[in-house]
């Protein structure tokens, strides 16, 4: 199999991995509920934590991050030394993220992408991911509002990508696209923040 064909296969596999709705699966298997019908209706870690406690939320966060981390690491291993290996690995990362936002298994109605995005940055730009985690912790600690922490961390991850790679590498631009999609997914949260109606967690 040619490197480009293998890269395309890995991109498709990345999308399918990203589409796995761990929040929904664990909600049904462990909690006996469909998390899409409780709280905010989101399938991500924050809403799972509302439905089943912090431990369940952390588990979903880790799994949602892992479904991006594993495909990226696999792509890097299988494409090591091949032409455009870094570009293909970045494409796999984006595909996993798109899978989380638009999962084929849920009629293309997915989550907001924060944990999956964090997993991507953890592999492609670890220092940016660390900056994002610190930013999340500080912003959430000050406000007790999850969306404020998530958006702060996302912005720092995107900035950290450019600080790590500059502007001539595909990773920071992919990171910027991911950050913009996360902000777009949080548009209702942003509106509530502006109105002072966003709930604390």
Curated annotation (Swiss-Prot):
Primary subcellular site in the record, as a coarse category: membrane
Cellular component terms per the entry's GO annotation: plasma membrane
Superkingdom, taxonomy of origin: Bacteria
Pfam families referenced in this protein's UniProt entry, alphabetically: G3P_acyltransf
Annotated TM spans: 5-25, 55-75, 88-108, 118-138, 164-184
UniProt keyword Amino-acid biosynthesis present: no
Catalytic activity from the UniProt record: an acyl phosphate + sn-glycerol 3-phosphate = a 1-acyl-sn-glycero-3-phosphate + phosphate
Membrane topology listed for this record: Multi-pass membrane protein
EC number: 2.3.1.275
InterPro entries: G3P_acylTferase_PlsY
MF annotations from Gene Ontology: acyl-phosphate glycerol-3-phosphate acyltransferase activity
GO terms, biological process: phospholipid biosynthetic process
Keywords in alphabetical order: Cell inner membrane, Cell membrane, Lipid biosynthesis, Lipid metabolism, Membrane, Phospholipid biosynthesis, Phospholipid metabolism, Transferase, Transmembrane, Transmembrane helix
Enzyme class per UniProt: transferase
Cellular compartments annotated: Cell inner membrane
Pathway, per record: Lipid metabolism; phospholipid metabolism
Role according to the record: Catalyzes the transfer of an acyl group from acyl-phosphate (acyl-PO(4)) to glycerol-3-phosphate (G3P) to form lysophosphatidic acid (LPA). This enzyme utilizes acyl-phosphate as fatty acyl donor, but not acyl-CoA or acyl-ACP.
Family listed: Belongs to the PlsY family.
Subunit structure: Probably interacts with PlsX.
Name assigned to this protein: Glycerol-3-phosphate acyltransferase
